[in-house]
Amino acid sequence: MPIQVLPPQLANQIAAGEVVERPASVVKELVENSLDAGATRIDIDIERGGAKLIRIRDNGCGIKKEELALALARHATSKIASLDDLEAIISLGFRGEALASISSVSRLTLTSRTAEQSEAWQAYAEGRDMDVTVKPAAHPVGTTLEVLDLFYNTPARRKFMRTEKTEFNHIDEIIRRIALARFDVTLNLSHNGKLVRQYRAVARDGQKERRLGAICGTPFLEQALAIEWQHGDLTLRGWVADPNHTTTALAEIQYCYVNGRMMRDRLINHAIRQACEEKLGADQQPAFVLYLEIDPHQVDVNVHPAKHEVRFHQSRLVHDFIYQGVLSVLQQQTETTLPLEEIAPAPRHVPENRIAAGRNHFAEPVVPTAAREPATPRYSGGASGGSGGRQSVGGWSHAQPGYQKQQGEVYRALLQTPAASSTPEPVAPALDGHSQSFGRVLTIVGGDCALLEHGGNIQLLSLPVAERWLRQAQLTPGQSPVCAQPLLIPLRLKVSADEKASLQKAQPFLGELGIEFQSDAQHVTIRAVPLPLRQQNLQILIPELIGYLAQQTTFATVNIAQWIARNVQSEHPQWSMAQAISLLADVERLCPQLVKAPPGGLLQPVDLHSAMNALKHE
């Protein structure tokens, strides 16, 4: 088949495979367009779960007549115009493909009027070439989009739609999320002619909490702790439920927004979970509604087809900022009974780690000594960048927890180091460089073998085999246990009952290898792995390890370490001289027995004498 340009309708339907997953996806895209148009009231009418009708009506700025045809074309948008705009996106939409994709899998009608126009105009696309027809219509200032018979021309997609109730529940959840993101917009949701949800626009903080209670429920509002945290261009606001009173129902409330865009970001979720883990059970999850504001240049939103995920340029900074913000409000909640004391200004600025005391380290700029104020109480009700506690009336709290006396005593105790011992520590004997050495690396052969010279003999060493033995030695606990390295984002996997039982039996042996996990009803969460596995693709390796353990009747640390060493991916597809020398140095240090008695497949002598004799006889 020759290469050819796809027809517009087919190209749009392919794009719709990413944009239009179900009716809720259509609602999300269209409502976000209304928000970008500056609408303050949006009416959403749904029939038969969105399969028959989706109608979005707003009072936004509208679309000019001459731009209606472009609105239904692919890659046409008013949101961005250059690469600089793409790198600093502040609108919800920016790709210019939603309307074209939706119109290719439904009967879409767009009616709009701007304030400058005396009449409205209606546009719809049809046919193989998606030609747009525009005609006059009656309509107030704003836009109405009607999507009829979704997936009518793609029966395979329509067959995979769920029941009417299920699809509407997904739409309802999307509207809930949008209502939490935009308190200043009125949202009305109707299903089959009946008004189901009505979220009126609110302005004051007390009214915001009423909408929060209407969406998330009174139990969440009663346990909600308000947060306001700031550092430079980073701002964190919202509510987190008191972990001591978090229930299974509350744990379903996990909403986070980045610059007003609803997200499902693992980094943010991990930071919140880590801040709450001391007060949460192993099978519990935190409940929160949080809003992160960040410089648009520091976040990339163009990394997911449905824009559900983002990528931060300084992910570690964002993670620690959120972690500290949530941790501080939780500590303030539990430490308000500790006495406060005044502290005289220090003679010079010494940065200190005050995360554990609940102080916002990010919000404290470095101030020259000469510009410092006289001694004042650390606790200040109006300090910017602080964290709030529980609020019943409304308003963001600006209270910042101060220096705690008890924590100061602990801190001073930690500074008291024991006297140095005059007894010298025994020095480990150095390995005999001659007897415990593979020899000198001459060159790399075939990309994965090292040619060695030792005592006038030439040998060929398999670098992948040597690396496997080194990994096994690094994983096998010796006199000191293997150090577990916590994962920035824990790996959560679904397991069967048999796999879960095998993991429970093998847990002591895995712990010796530095693999730490927690399990609940149907899932296991890997929280730490040993250092040699940090750079591995754990989403592939761990399920394979679980499958291996499920097939075993008895467990031994050495056998598990050997299996892992054989199944990890090599970090060096092509070896260099420096990498080979470094590997052999580690093998000689950790596995001296391999030098004395090399196992099969590691070393192969090269017979130079026969080659030399052959040359002499020529």
From Swiss-Prot:
Pfam families: DNA_mis_repair (PF01119), HATPase_c_3 (PF13589), MutL_C (PF08676). The keyword DNA damage applies. Residues 382-392 have a biased composition (Gly residues). InterPro entries: DNA_mismatch_repair_CS, DNA_mismatch_repair_MutL, DNA_mismatch_S5_2-like, HATPase_C_sf, MutL/Mlh/PMS, MutL/Mlh/Pms-like, MutL_C, MutL_C_dimsub. PROSITE patterns: DNA_MISMATCH_REPAIR_1. SUPFAM superfamilies: ATPase domain of HSP90 chaperone/DNA topoisomerase II/histidine kinase, DNA mismatch repair protein MutL, Ribosomal protein S5 domain 2-like. It comes from the Bacteria. Keywords: DNA damage, DNA repair. Residues 371-401 are annotated as: Disordered. One of its GO terms (molecular function) is ATP hydrolysis activity. GO terms for biological process: mismatch repair. Gene3D superfamilies: 3.30.230.10, Histidine kinase-like ATPase, C-terminal domain, MutL, C-terminal domain, dimerisation subdomain, MutL, C-terminal domain, regulatory subdomain. One of its GO terms (cellular component) is mismatch repair complex. This protein is involved in the repair of mismatches in DNA. It is required for dam-dependent methyl-directed DNA mismatch repair. May act as a 'molecular matchmaker', a protein that promotes the formation of a stable complex between two or more DNA-binding proteins in an ATP-dependent manner without itself being part of a final effector complex. Belongs to the DNA mismatch repair MutL/HexB family. This is DNA mismatch repair protein MutL. The lineage of its organism: Bacteria, Pseudomonadati, Pseudomonadota, Gammaproteobacteria, Enterobacterales. The gene is mutL.
